[in-house]
A protein has these predicted regions:
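Conserved mixed alpha/beta catalytic, RNA-binding, or beta-rich assembly cores of soluble enzyme
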Residues: 1-316
Length: 316
């Protein structure tokens, strides 16, 4: 038997805890998911990161990134190497991810202090819908526990932006940063500045594109796109502004290759349009079309970490 608690009920039972954000993003086409957690403290986030990585389950990678704990996983169920923390077992882990309509069910295991994390901390985060507990649930001490945490099904949307400035005024990275911060739809995840080919003849100065990513409900994507388009339209100083839109957790390899090559190769707009069409990227002309190369490249480079911000010579 189980019992169910809402976040406010968990908070009332255990007192206020530390989880500031908890998002479950899914990419059902590729059978993968990503769990993003914002924690108030560096210590518990780092401990959870290494233990979840060691415990395996459905996790394929766990890392700290941009102040967030990011967990890549496969949709389904996996075997846990779970127990007191030591070389071959971890004290906290994710056993299963299931998509149930508009919700995602994640099954967590924790022991001792880690049971508090999965039983009291995450479940009281406002991003959680409800948590299901077994009747014999106990946390802390030496207790081992498991729970099912149910959250809204979210998807990742990347919005690339280029050519919003002139030699007199403007900065594309500022436009996209403001757009992400002020967007009322979804949750802002990351902001990137993507270095393009410094030898591009039509550059402003540094020749950079930019992009932001969001966690959003699928039915809210049209509203997100509408907000981004109109925000950029009001903020741009250029007649050649383009935004691009990509949904998913896996940027296609051909799109990544194009993005990287834009750091050293000079392309025509039609090249970028073709790559976009072949790889599921929506291109939106805001005030023109010359910005399409950078806006497509920004999506391609989005998951490259520091490499997105540099030129190839920086990494030789």
């Amino acid at each position: 038997m189980t019992y169910v608690l809402r976040p406010d009920e968990v908070r009332e039972k255990y007192g206020p805890m530390f989880c500031k954000g908890f998002y479950t993003l899914v990419d059902e086409e590729n059978g993968v998911a990503q769990i993003i957690e914002r924690c108030s403290g560096q210590g518990p986030a780092e401990w959870d990161t290494v233990n979840r990585r060691r415990t395996k389950g459905v996790a394929t990678d766990v890392r700290m990134k941009s102040g967030m704990m990011v967990m890549d996983a496969v949709i389904g169920e996996g075997d846990l190497r779970f127990g007191p923390a030591q070389a071959d077992t971890g004290g906290q882990g994710l056993k299963a991810i299931k998509v149930e309509g508009s919700e995602v069910r994640t099954t967590w295991y924790g022991i001792a202090g880690a049971s508090v994390g999965i039983g009291a901390c995450i479940p009281q985060c406002p991003d959680v819908i409800r948590t299901e507990y077994p009747d014999d649930f106990k946390i802390g001490g030496a207790h081992s526990a498991h729970v099912d945490i149910i959250t809204p099904k979210l998807v990742r949307v990347i919005i690339g932006v280029d050519d919003t400035d002139t030699k007199e005024k403007g900065a594309s990275w500022v436009t996209s940063m403001k757009m992400g911060a002020q967007c009322p739809v979804g949750k802002l995840l990351e902001h990137k500045i993507v270095q393009l080919n410094p030898k591009a003849p039509n550059k402003t100065t540094n020749c950079c594109a930019t992009a932001v990513s969001f966690a959003v409900k699928e039915e809210e994507i049209p509203a997100l796109i509408e907000f981004a388009t109109e925000f950029v339209r009001k903020e741009t100083y250029s007649d050649d502004t383009v935004i691009t839109v990509f949904k998913g957790l896996k940027v296609p390899e051909a799109l990544r290759e194009f993005g990287w090559s834009c750091k050293s190769v000079l392309y025509k707009p039609e090249d970028a349009i073709r790559i976009a069409e072949e790889n599921g990227v929506q291109v939106i002309s805001v005030t023109g079309m010359k910005g399409v190369i950078g806006a497509v490249a920004a999506v391609g480079c989005f998951d490259m970490g520091e490499a997105a911000a540099g030129v190839p010579e920086d990494f030789e």
